[in-house]
UniProtKB/Swiss-Prot annotation:
This is Trimethylamine N-oxide transport system permease protein TmoV. SUPFAM superfamilies: MetI-like. It is found in: Cell inner membrane. Induction: Expression is induced by TMAO. It comes from Ruegeria pomeroyi (strain ATCC 700808 / DSM 15171 / DSS-3) (Silicibacter pomeroyi).
Length: 658
């Protein structure tokens, strides 16, 4: 009798994700308990300084080599001179700065009238009223000069960002290897704190409008690159084949086939460029950029809420106007005329805009208020608003409520959470983050999460990073508890949903640091005010994506639930919310990204996190430290973005959703 044996070769099967993840969490908990018992080695609690690489010193050495030895500083100074000429020209035209060509300023009424005509061409009377009304408000509220200081940089930075982004996007589309290198760079650029953009701009391009224009341009380039590449990749093969059959050269294919076919995506990129430029040009007030941002900072410093609110409204109106007009440009199809159509018919709106501009320019020479609104003629009600707010804050009931909220959050929630997170050993913290990524997303994400947080630990800024993360998680958790129920209730009725989404748009377009004022006035210089300022900003995407997720639940699913006799709550919990979860997860991810952005601005309240250290770097030339701190924020933000989006994609695939 013979016995047949079968040999198995290969490696042992890998542990299931759940088992491995729970084991990692168990190990992290055990290490934390050992630390509390005083039995954990000190080097496992915090990495010894001896093994912390001097990243900042290395970066400073590279920076000094590039700046001095390679002559980059001399080159950027030449570029600065050229950029100053352009900025001086726009400043002269828009608000009368005494520079070439010495023909400004253009009357505010001429700009308002011309913009109204452009608005009518793009979107009819409503758009015309919005566009013209925005500039009328800006002039009559007494903010024309500071608004035009901001716009004089915006009209230079936005075209620069568009041109550079378009060229790089086309290059990435043509070269997959270049695209593969560019993608991670763009991911980092989109998550870097805005302070990290400001210091290099100051060092290479001087303090003021030139540095502001450069920082604004660089900040706005990434979405233009991404949308250009996406649009060109989506051009249908049939369109390409038709161009080749027509005998087009490479340049003709790009100019007359690819770019027109990718028009929608490219114009969406233009919209994003304009909005990011407006957001950043306000924030460049921190490096001496005059305009709305600088005035808002000055008003905030003296707690003039009324004037701050009026400036915030102006920024919101400008943002909404530019957003709506650029979006209308995206959807508006090019007009085609028969051969021989007269010029004045083909370009009637252009002629109307020129006519309105010239007409009001001439009228303004006779009617002074149409050229410049004096202080006595201004509609500003800033002082009256300040009086109302002070009266509101003096009400006993308001003080009792805010004091109670501050006490409960500070004593029972925020301080214990901060102390607990700081008490966790570094290695245990990294293990826990990696385990969470493994359970939620997968092995690849777990490895990257461990690498990212491990690198944060190696920078030597671990405690500051943990405090930053604690502020983000605390604010987003409260935002989740408030934002999701608001979104669920609002999604029930179309009118309510539209009203709430309008409120979200308005809240998102307000300058981010304006939220610091009510937080400080209500809750003082405390951790509560930091969290509250982040909370308002980060709650917007949670509300928005909850509404969108519930709106996009397939009708057949809700109809099936109705036919099965489900109650409203059963339908919500068992059908609508599960199907909306992938979309809601995107909102949660956006909330965390917004929170990481806002927590840096909240450093002005007096935090002890990375934002405070980043703010200090602006006072000197410590570029290495600036980059290291910015990378710490980026690595933490990228970890959450990677894990949440992977979970959302997997959930969509399991549910069969596009």
């Amino acid at each position: 009798m013979s016995v047949t044996t079968t040999e198995t070769t290969g490696t042992a099967p890998a542990l299931p994700r759940k088992t491995l993840g729970l084991a990692m969490i168990g190990l992290a908990v055990m290490m934390t308990l050992l630390h509390y018992a005083g039995l954990l080695p000190a080097w496992l609690h915090r990495l010894p300084e001896a093994i912390i690489p001097p990243f900042a010193t290395w970066l400073d050495a590279i920076f000094n080599f590039v700046k001095d030895d390679l002559g980059l500083l001399a080159l950027t100074r030449l570029l600065t001179d050229g950029l100053e000429v352009v900025l001086d020209a726009t400043a002269n035209l828009l608000f009368g700065k005494r520079r070439w060509p010495n023909i400004g300023p253009i009357p505010w009424s001429a700009i308002a009238a011309m913009t109204a005509v452009v608005g009518y061409y793009l979107g009819g009377w409503r758009m015309a009223l919005l566009a013209g009304g925005t500039f009328v408000w800006t002039a009559m509220i007494g903010q024309w000069d500071i608004a035009m200081q901001t716009m004089s940089v915006l009209v230079v930075a936005a075209p620069l960002a568009f041109a550079i982004g378009l060229v790089l996007g086309i290059s990435a589309w043509k070269s997959p290897s270049f695209d593969a290198v560019l993608r991670p760079v763009l991911a980092v650029l989109q998550t870097l704190p805005f302070f990290t953009y400001l210091l290099p701009a100051v060092i290479f391009f001087k303090v003021g409008p030139t540095a502001g224009a450069v920082a604004t341009t660089v900040y706005a380039i990434p979405p233009m690159i991404l949308m250009t590449t996406l649009g060109l990749q989506k051009v249908s093969p049939e369109v390409v084949e038709a161009g080749k059959m027509s005998g087009c050269t490479r340049w003709q294919m790009l100019r007359h086939v690819y770019i027109p076919a990718a028009r929608t995506e490219i114009l969406v990129g233009v919209n994003q460029v304009i909005m990011l430029c407006l957001a950043m040009v306000v924030l460049t007030a921190f490096i001496g950029m005059p305009g709305l941002g600088a005035k808002l900072l000055a008003m905030m410093g003296s707690f003039k809420i009324g004037r701050s609110f009026e400036i915030g409204v102006t920024i919101v109106l400008l943002a909404v106007t530019l957003d709506r007009m650029s979006k209308a440009w995206v959807v508006k199809l090019p007009e085609h005329f028969e051969r021989g159509t007269p010029f004045w018919i083909r370009h009637k709106f252009l002629l109307m805009a020129i006519g309105a501009f010239v007409g009001f320019t001439l009228i303004a020479q006779v009617v002074p208020i149409l050229s410049e609104v004096g202080r006595k003629q201004s509609w500003s009600q800033g002082k009256e608003i300040d009086t109302l707010i002070k009266g509101f804050l003096a009400i006993d009931a308001v003080q009792a409520i805010t004091n109670s909220i501050r006490y409960v959050l500070n004593i029972w929630v925020l301080n214990p959470l901060r102390d607990f997170m700081l008490s966790i050993p570094t290695v245990a913290f990294v293990l826990f983050i990696s385990a969470a990524a493994l359970l939620v997303a997968g092995r690849r994400e777990a490895v990257l999460a461990a690498a990212f947080f491990g690198l944060v630990a190696l920078t030597g800024w671990w405690d500051r990073s943990v405090i930053t993360l604690y502020s983000v998680l605390a604010a987003v958790s409260i935002a989740l508890l408030l934002g999701v129920p608001i979104g669920v209730v609002a999604a029930r009725k179309e009118k309510t949903a539209n009203a709430v989404l309008l409120a979200c748009d308005t809240a998102q377009t307000f300058p981010s640091f304006i939220y610091l004022i009510p937080a400080i006035m209500l809750f003082g210089i405390t951790a509560t005010s930091v969290v509250m300022s982040i909370l308002i900003f980060s709650m917007v995407p949670l509300v928005r994506y909850t509404i969108e997720g519930l709106r996009n639940v397939p009708d057949e699913m809700t109809e099936a639930a109705d036919m099965a006799g489900a109650t409203r709550m059963q339908k919500l919990w068992n059908v609508q919310l599960p199907l909306a979860l992938p979309t809601m997860a995107v909102g949660f991810n956006q909330a965390i990204m917004f929170a990481f952005f806002m927590v840096i601005i909240a450093a002005f309240i007096g935090t002890q996190d990375l934002g405070q250290e980043l703010q200090r770097t602006l006072a000197g030339t410590d570029l290495g430290k600036n980059f290291v701190l910015g990378i710490c924020v980026t690595l933490m933000a990228l970890t959450f973005d990677m894990v949440i989006m992977k979970w959302a994609d997997d959930k969509k695939a399991r549910l069969g959703l596009n």
